Amino acid sequence: QSKVVTDSIYSQVLKAHRAYTIYLPQSYSNETDRKYPILYLLHGMSGVNTSWFTDQRVKDVMDQLVASGEACEMIIVSPNAGGNPATCWNGYFNMPGWAYEDFFYKEFLPYIEKTYRVKGDKRHRAIAGLSMGGGGTASYAQRYPDMYCAAYAMSALMNIPVSGEEVGRDPDPTNKMAVLTRSVQEHSC
């Protein structure tokens, strides 16, 4: 039986616990010498680490895909990148007072790949995300092309509000961080 587990990691970078939810395939508990490919699955704005597993039923979908032979067994992990859902969602990027990208690459990814039996190389590591998570996916795939064999950015959010800005409010565009746009400019050929 596959399983979904929610846990947390303390981040020295963010000075806080950050939750994550992880899908472990059916053979994970029995085949203790086996390592698995991994998909980092980034939630959208107003989502949390559990959203992919509750709203989009990742466990059920993966179990069906593996059973039909359409997908191989893999580990899927979704970290929480949200802030206060009523006001601000800082997301997957570094900005004043929020160094999430540093946390992701210096703490989270190494922790996951050490704690769980992950094939921790480019050939076996992918990233995907929706909305805010799609923006994180596109930016990370461009900034760290040697890290991922595949990236899937769904409806990528281009403008990330400045930390503390109210979601849905449209402040002066000169005050917004267009992280993905900047990433495209800096990392494209």
Annotate each PLM feature:
Residues Q1-C189:
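Non-catalytic cap/lid and distal C-terminal segments of serine-dependent acyl enzymes
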